């Protein structure tokens, strides 16, 4: 039975970043359900926008994005739509439009060969025994059993590691649904859509490489029905759909209290969305995935006597920032306050009257 210093479950942005940073410094094994290349197998449904905080992480690490990861077009504003109030506002944002699956595979490709990576693998069982973490996983057609001093859960919203460590922990979840359509709009755009009759979270649209992606986060019970209802409503705001080319869905976490951020225990650690590190106001998680990976790297290399306590302290600033996103989310999803903010025109950039796309309903009071 092979033994490692660190076993990482999941190679999204958080797991890939940590594996790369620990390579050559610790003996690391990493398991991931995505294939090593190509479009077959698992791919994460995601709008694919790289926020400024994530961009700063790449600057810090001296990395530049390859052209095959970057999507077309690059748009510098977000149309914010309040459906009930028939209001549309235009806010400047500095996102980078990316192909999320290509981005994830590129992040994995940066992991040095000294890390033992198993692609297209499935973690079957984890447990702690004799001060070691035991992991049974299936890869290359057969089951393997390894042990590790440290276990890292970088396995996202449905984290197996989080469920094992905190079996009674409850965090609000939504089903994220999105569909891809052939782009019909004369000018591509991003949008953020609020409709409290549909969801107390939000919906979105993104133009990407000739496609129009429309999605949102909805209650788990009847998410598909709510998604369909919102699509019908958006025709009043000049959204054009047609026949769906592809449909995707996944679970997304929605932290709503301080206790929703969990970092691990007993030499097991959680990073990225597995720890609840996702923005409640935008559902953006890549920047927090990269930041938490960097924090855990520093903890591992310092080898403190109480690693879990050190990681908890080191993530305090990150957790405070994310708690601020919870407060912001409550403001954005409060109909009266949101309507007041949008009516005030603060930070709104008006577009020319003859601009070819004005996403307002016929009853708009702009």
Curated annotation (Swiss-Prot):
Q: Which SUPFAM superfamilies match?
A: FAD/NAD(P)-binding domain
Q: Report the GO molecular function annotations.
A: FAD binding
Family membership: Belongs to the CbrA family.
Q: Which Pfam families match?
A: FAD_binding_3 (PF01494)
Task: Cite the InterPro entries for this sequence.
Answer: FAD-bd, FAD/NAD-bd_sf, Geranylgeranyl_reductase
Name of the protein in its database record: Protein CbrA
């Amino acid at each position: 039975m092979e033994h490692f210093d660190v076993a990482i479950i999941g190679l999204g942005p958080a797991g890939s970043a940590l594996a790369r940073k620990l390579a050559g410094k610790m003996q690391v094994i990493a398991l991931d359900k995505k294939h090593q290349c190509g479009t077959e197998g698992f791919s994460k449904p995601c709008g694919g926008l790289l926020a400024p905080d994530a961009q700063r992480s790449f600057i810090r690490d001296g990395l530049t994005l390859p052209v095959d990861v970057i999507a077309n077009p690059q748009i510098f504003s977000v149309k914010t739509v309040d459906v009930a109030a028939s209001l549309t506002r235009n806010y400047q944002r500095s996102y980078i439009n990316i192909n999320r699956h290509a981005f994830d595979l590129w992040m994995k490709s940066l992991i040095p060969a000294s890390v033992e990576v198993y692609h297209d693998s499935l973690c079957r069982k984890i447990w702690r025994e004799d001060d070691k973490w035991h992991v049974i996983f299936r890869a290359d057609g057969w089951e393997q059993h390894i042990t590790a001093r440290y276990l890292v859960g970088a396995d996202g919203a449905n984290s197996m590691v989080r469920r094992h460590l905190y079996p009674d922990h409850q965090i609000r979840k939504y089903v994220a649904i999105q569909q891809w359509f052939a782009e019909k709009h004369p000018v591509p755009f991003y949008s953020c859509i609020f409709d409290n009759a549909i969801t107390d979270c939000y919906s979105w649209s993104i133009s990407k490489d000739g496609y129009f992606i429309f999605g949102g986060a909805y209650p788990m019970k009847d998410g598909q029905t709510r998604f369909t209802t919102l699509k019908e409503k958006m025709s009043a705001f000049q959204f054009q759909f047609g026949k769906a080319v592809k449909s995707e869905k996944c679970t997304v976490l929605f932290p709503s209290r301080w206790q929703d951020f969990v970092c691990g225990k007993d030499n097991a650690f959680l990073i990225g969305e597995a720890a609840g590190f996702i923005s409640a106001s935008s559902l953006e998680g890549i920047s927090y995935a990269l930041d938490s990976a960097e924090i855990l790297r520093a903890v591992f290399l310092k080898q403190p006597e109480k690693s879990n306590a050190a990681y908890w302290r080191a993530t305090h600033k990150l957790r405070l920032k994310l708690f601020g996103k919870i407060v912001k989310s409550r403001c954005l999803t409060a109909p009266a306050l949101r309507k007041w903010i949008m009516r005030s025109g603060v930070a709104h950039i008006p577009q020319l009257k003859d601009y070819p796309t004005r996403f307002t309903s016929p009853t708009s009071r702009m």
